[in-house]
Curated annotation (Swiss-Prot):
Biased composition (Polar residues): 65-74, 81-110
Family: Belongs to the gas vesicle GvpI family.
Lineage, highest ranks first: Archaea, Methanobacteriati, Methanobacteriota, Stenosarchaea group, Halobacteria
Induction per the UniProt record: Transcribed from early-log phase, decreases as cells enter stationary phase, probably as a long gvpF-gvpM RNA. Highly expressed in 25% salt, poorly expressed in 15% salt, no gas vesicles are formed at 15% salt.
Subunit structure: GvpF to GvpM interact with each other in vitro, and may form multi-subunit complex(es). Interacts with GvpC and GvpO.
A GO CC term assigned to this protein in UniProt: gas vesicle
Protein name as it appears in the record: Gas vesicle protein I
Taxonomic source organism: Haloferax mediterranei (strain ATCC 33500 / DSM 1411 / JCM 8866 / NBRC 14739 / NCIMB 2177 / R-4)
Keyword annotations: Gas vesicle
Residue segments, region Disordered: 1-162
Function description: Proteins GvpF to GvpM might be involved in nucleating gas vesicle formation. A minor component of the gas vesicle. Gas vesicles are hollow, gas filled proteinaceous nanostructures found in some microorganisms. They allow positioning of halobacteria at the optimal depth for growth in the poorly aerated, shallow brine pools of their habitat. Expression of a 9.5 kb mc-vac DNA fragment containing 2 divergently transcribed regions (gvpD-gvpE-gvpF-gvpG-gvpH-gvpI-gvpJ-gvpK-gvpL-gvpM and gvpA-gvpC-gvpN-gvpO) allows H.volcanii to produce gas vesicles.
């Protein structure tokens, strides 16, 4: 390399380093903004769920104290309150349904009824409503279902009530 080429190469390398630093700084600031926004949204959600649960007085107290605090940073607020409360105590997921409700949902099996390249039919698989009907059947029917559905090895050993 000649002197001029070497200079140009070094200049491009410096420019690449500066550009990389700028991009890193932009990404960091973007992540910080996202985290702050998420923290605000979670705090709002916690307050709303507390109000829904009937803890109105606590939520009102939190709202008043938050407006009094103004624009303090999170670390300053944490130092004043003695640390953060458990952030995982508030779930953003909807409440889980009961097993019976989940069983009634539209469910389907992706397993074919007749296995490919086989002349033997596949064993019956229970999903959705059929599973719900089988599991909520009367006690005597569920015993017979358990006997007929017992694994082959268990039937050979005589482990199922026959």
């Amino acid at each position: 390399m000649t002197g001029k080429q070497h200079q140009k190469h070094e200049q491009k390398a410096r420019q690449a380093q500066v550009k990389a630093q700028i991009n890193r700084d932009k990404a960091r600031s973007k992540l910080l903004r996202q985290r702050e926004k998420l923290a605000r949204r979670r705090a709002r959600n916690r307050r709303q769920s507390e109000v829904r649960r009937g803890n109105q007085s606590k939520a009102q107290h939190d709202t008043q104290s938050e407006t009094q605090r103004g624009t303090q940073s999170k670390s300053q607020r944490d130092n004043e309150t003695g640390g953060t409360k458990n952030p995982t105590a508030h779930s953003t997921l909807p409440p889980q349904k009961t097993n019976a409700e989940n069983a009634v949902r539209n469910s389907h099996s992706t397993v074919p009824e007749l296995p490919k390249y086989s002349s033997v039919p596949a064993r019956e698989r229970l999903y959705g409503l059929r599973l719900h009907r089988e599991t909520t059947a009367s006690e005597d029917k569920s015993v017979t279902v358990a006997v007929t559905r017992a694994p082959k090895a268990e039937r050979q050993r005589g482990g199922a009530d026959e």
